[in-house]
Amino acid sequence: MVSSEFISKIEFACKKKESLYSQSKFKYAIRSMFAGAFLTFSTAAGAVGADLINKIAPGSGRFLFPFVFAWGLAYIVFLNAELVTSNMMFLTAGSFLKKISWRKTAEILLYCTLFNLIGALIAGWGFAHSAAYANLTHDSFISGVVEMKLGRSNELVLLEGILANIFVNIAILSFVLVKDGGAKLWLVLSAIYMFVFLTNEHIAANFAFFAIVKFSVAADSIANFDIPNILRHWGVTFVGNFIGGGLLMGLPYAFLNKNEDTYVD
């Protein structure tokens, strides 16, 4: 008889998150802000790198940016920050397994989302006013990404959001279940690289993209860059991410491991 490591990890994660949230919402907010900020740091560095390498080999920035961005997720998982999209998997699985209530899951997800955004806004403001972004234009890499995203239909954003959070939670499950530290890192980087390269929609990554551009000198040159359209995009992305991470990753893995003592994760 073999016990499920997946279930024990889910139970531990749910208890840890619920305990911190209940005992100190301020501390939970800080961990959530770190997650939004870490992704903004790697987004900012990757976008500048993409612009520089595009001058040498046009189009090559598309390959460089995802690699630099992926380190932001690595920082999150290794440094215990609270990311809403991974919490969608943990908490949905936990609710199905009765380790946490559905109401508390919804409450934590919304709170985490808010402070992921605040962390991204603070970091985004800083980078937008830094020397590296002083000459940002409509033709810069990050401007093009934001304009492309905001031009997408709800249906496409939903699909891209589902796909993104399947990739993200492949990374998270690999980090949780794989023993070797080096293997954990490369599995995380590989899955994140893929979703970013494919331009899938991830709510916290979009917080980072949009925050940097919003506070930059290029903001007024971006088509459809207005609050209603941004909120539309974020709302649909959130739903897509929940479907991908919660319903298509967390829920199935919880079902596969529940009441099993042989074929378990």
What are these regions (language model features)?
Residues 1-265:
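Alpha-helical transmembrane segments and their helix-helix packing motifs
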